[in-house]
Design a protein with these regions (language model features):
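Active-site segment of extracytoplasmic enzymes that catalyze sulfate/phosphate-ester chemistry
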Residues: 35, 245-246
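N-terminal Rossmann-fold NAD(P) dinucleotide-binding loop
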Residues: 217
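Extracytoplasmic
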Residues: 36-201
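Gly/Ala-rich phosphate-binding loop of Rossmann-like dinucleotide-binding domains
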Residues: 221, 225
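Bacterial N-terminal signal peptides
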Residues: 18-31
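Beta1/beta-strand and adjacent pyrophosphate-binding region of the FAD-binding site
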Residues: 202-214
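Glycine-rich FAD pyrophosphate-binding loop
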Residues: 226-245
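N-terminal secretory signal peptides that target proteins for export/translocation
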Residues: 1-17
Length: 247
């Protein structure tokens, strides 16, 4: 059905509201925490899918490298509020933990590690402090931990307010397993862990595809819709407006 048929008498503001709601819905759908894990399979937790992201911001800057957004502790020097979520551990035992992160100043060989943060398991921090090594995105190992079967609370605790970054968390009870760090192996593995299909679902045919919800994108999508075109509007931010938004 064409937008003109769907909204024959709607004002521009009403169209913007509907487009915004659709874009936000797509953003929410894309933020999946984890699929139901098998007892002996690695458990992948996408940070942007945390039930409560607290003061951490969802940032899609490196989606071309990782295939999904990540959480960013943008606190201007003041530690941000904790991010929290719950996952299910299918089998009790000893698990190794990894966090995909980076030391964002390491590429300039700058002193200090301003993006430091902790991972808390049921309120208890792991001994490893994350975001302290590596100029590139990588899986920083967090050691071994004994986990009981059932619900588990995860908390990301920012230590500095200076751009700590967390992409994902992995738990594995296989002592020989190491998460892949490069594509295409990593992309294939992440799709498998999350239960995503190998090929994207066909969303149909459109007269116009608009990518980006900035002022230009909004105007293009609204104008095309009002002219009767079937428009696909792609937006990876939680709000519309681009550089003119509340972000």
């Amino acid at each position: 059905m064409h937008p003109k048929e769907m909204f024959p008498n709607h004002s521009t503001q009403q169209l913007i509201n509907r487009i915004g709601a659709a874009a936000i819905s797509l953003f929410a759908i894309a933020s999946v925490v984890s699929a139901a894990p098998k007892a002996d399979a690695p458990i992948l937790v996408e940070a942007e899918g945390f039930a409560d992201t607290g003061g951490w911001a969802v940032d899609p800057q490196f989606m071309d490298l990782m295939g999904s957004p990540y959480l960013l502790a943008h606190g201007l020097g003041v530690p941000v509020k904790d991010a929290n979520t719950e996952i299910n551990i299918p089998k009790a035992g000893s698990y190794r933990v990894w966090v995909r992160t980076k030391d964002w100043v390491a590429q300039w060989k700058a002193p200090g590690t301003p993006g430091k943060f902790q991972l808390l398991i049921n309120g208890k921090p792991l001994k490893t402090t994350f975001g302290t090594v590596g100029a590139q995105w990588h899986w920083q190992e967090g050691g071994k931990i004994q986990l009981a079967k059932g619900k588990l609370k995860l908390t990301l605790h920012d230590l500095t307010g200076f751009e700590g970054r967390c992409d994902a968390i992995v738990f594995s009870n296989d002592p020989t397993f190491t998460p892949p760090n490069k594509d295409p192996e990593m992309a294939s593995w992440r799709r498998q862990c999350l239960g995503h299909p190998k090929q994207p679902e066909n969303a149909g045919e459109y007269d116009l595809v608009v990518t980006g919800g900035g002022i230009a994108g909004i105007c293009a999508a609204v104008t095309a819709s009002r002219l009767g075109l079937k428009v696909a509007f792609i937006q990876d931010r939680p709000v519309l407006g681009g550089n003119n938004s509340s972000e």
